[in-house]
Amino acid sequence: METELIKDRSLSSCIKTANNLLGVNFAKTIKGTWLPALLIAIMTAILGFSILQSLHSFSPTIPEYDLFPMALGIVSWLGSIALWAYFFASVVNLVSESSFKQNLRRSFAITAVELIFYLVMMAIGGAIIRMVVMSYINKPLTPSFFTLVGGISLAWILLTALLMVPFRYAEMRYLLSPTGSLRRNLIAYYVSGVRGSGLLIGSSFFTALASICLGLVIFLPTIILLGAKTSSLIGELTLNDPSGLPTYFNALFIGSLVLTTFIFMMVMVWTVFVFYYAYGSIEHRRQMKKQRQAATAE
């Protein structure tokens, strides 16, 4: 793909350029990303089906709790993370001069770092919540307690999301630098991302908002099917009614989830392109700053 990466761009310019890149090269994008997108769609369908099946675990007609859907869900979640690294490498490979093998290896490495960082943040947040709960162990659980726990949880989630933003720059810098070392340069990459956090936060907010809005439209058939399943289950549990769903409902649900997820992955391609150009803009500003400092030193 022909791209003009290193250039000073505003958020709106990054979005517009990403739109143009995807629109002009849509066929090439599909060709380069269809396999990981399909695998993610299948994995999402497995995860969705496991959640669907776990709803029966709460039915009084089933005497024992079925752990299989839960185990399947955990495996699917971990598999989805690995497939996302594969998908991300495939998207970057469209605009990178490096080999796909190198992009894939680096994508797995930076994804593993991000996952570890996320899990550490969640563990710290869980420990804080536990300390708050333990402080109320011998006290009545008033509405203020639930407000406090909810407020702390929300604040920690927002803090974690904010601290994850600089990784959007770090992952692009790492994959697009032919000789960059993650072990030696991770902190430097992250700090550069912090310095360009204004553009990255704006890109994160807009792409998240756009993804949510488009996702609600794309996943509407699946949402309707899930609502039908929930209504049927409520009738079974409260009124002892027989299930009114057709025998092919599970196949219909899985097929719908695979198709809608595959379509949604094209939205994810667009978000990667937005951060690609945001990275280019931050790099341009960083290089211009270095040149000004060098000129001043002379």
Residue ranges and their predicted role:
Residues 43-80, 122-160, 215-265:
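Membrane-helix interface segments in multi-pass membrane proteins
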Residues 15, 30-31, 74-75, 108, ...:
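Hydrophobic alpha-helical transmembrane segments
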Residues 63, 100-109, 185-197:
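Membrane-interface segments at loop-to-transmembrane junctions
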Residues 5, 63, 87-100, 163-183, ...:
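Juxtamembrane transition segments at transmembrane-helix termini in multipass membrane proteins
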Residues 19-33, 89-121:
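Cytosolic-side membrane-entry/anchor segment at the start of a transmembrane helix
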Residues 1-56, 157-235:
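Nonpolar helix-loop interface/hinge motif
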Residues 12, 78-91:
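Central hydrophobic cores of alpha-helical transmembrane segments in multi-pass inner-membrane proteins
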Residues 72-80, 109-133, 197-206, 210, ...:
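Hydrophobic alpha-helical transmembrane segments of integral membrane proteins
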